[in-house]
UniProtKB/Swiss-Prot annotation:
Keywords tagged on the record: Magnesium, Metal-binding, Thiamine biosynthesis, Transferase
Name of the protein described by the UniProt record: Thiamine-phosphate synthase
Record: residues binding 4-amino-2-methyl-5-(diphosphooxymethyl)pyrimidine: Q37, V38, R39, E40, K41, N69, S108, K137
Keyword hit for Metal-binding: yes
Organism this protein belongs to: Clostridium botulinum (strain Kyoto / Type A2)
Pathway(s) where this gene product acts: Cofactor biosynthesis; thiamine diphosphate biosynthesis; thiamine phosphate from 4-amino-2-methyl-5-diphosphomethylpyrimidine and 4-methyl-5-(2-phosphoethyl)-thiazole: step 1/1
EC identifiers of the protein: 2.5.1.3
Gene that produces this protein: thiE
Lineage of the organism: Bacteria, Bacillati, Bacillota, Clostridia, Eubacteriales
Length: 205
């Protein structure tokens, strides 16, 4: 499956401001988002399922891949395109056994060692970060900057997206590393005009 990782949106319902998540995701896709990850923390399984199913109606309509953060059961239940796993989540090999070879599995990495391990274990793509300081990541030691991103990117051969503090003022510097895409939350979701916010993060608009 050929995936376009150029503009990777991660959902966060804290930014809804009374708006409908389905509408936000649709506007983001119309603005240029190429892949959507549904991430829900501290909610029941049923609520996560309902949110993911709702988002999938939109991504299916626009033929955009939908990735589920961490929860393989939710990914299976809605027949998502794949899952994204952190370093402390289920091991990639086990996830692959459960989901099969046709599903996308992405892994979060913060250094070359983690990146090579994920690649060797069969990850389809990597989420590399944290690139810049961000409100959602309080661990300053985890910030790797453009230099850290470049080192990791140069060590691997699979697609990757950069994450962490990326916005319309710095995304071009990130893309100069040759990375396949950028992953954002607030740079799109915290804006009033979702479609425009997404469009402002496209290099070839």
């Amino acid at each position: 499956m050929e995936i376009n990782y150029e503009l990777y949106l991660i959902t966060d319902r804290r930014f809804l401001k009374g708006r409908q998540l389905k509408k936000i995701v649709e506007d983001a896709i119309l603005g240029g988002v190429t892949i959507v990850q549904v991430r829900e923390k501290d909610v029941s399984t049923r609520e996560f399922y309902n949110v993911a199913k709702e988002v999938k109606e939109v991504t299916d309509y626009y033929k955009v891949p939908i990735i589920i953060n961490d929860r393989l059961d939710i990914a299976q239940a809605i027949d998502a395109s794949g899952v994204h796993l952190g370093q402390k989540d289920m091991h990639l090999n086990i996830a692959r056994e459960i989901l099969g070879k046709d599903k996308i599995i992405g892994i979060s990495v913060g250094n070359v060692k983690e990146a090579l391990e994920a690649q060797n274990n069969g990850a389809d793509y990597l989420g590399i970060g944290t690139i810049f300081p961000t409100g959602s990541k309080k661990d300053v030691d985890a910030i790797i900057g453009i230099d850290g991103l470049s080192k990791i990117k140069d060590s691997i051969s699979i697609p990757s997206v950069a994450i962490g503090g990326i916005n319309k003022t710095n995304f071009k510097d990130v893309l100069k590393t040759g990375i396949e895409g950028i992953s954002v939350i607030s740079a799109i979701l915290d804006e009033d005009d979702i479609k425009l916010a997404a469009n402002n993060l496209l290099i070839n608009k």
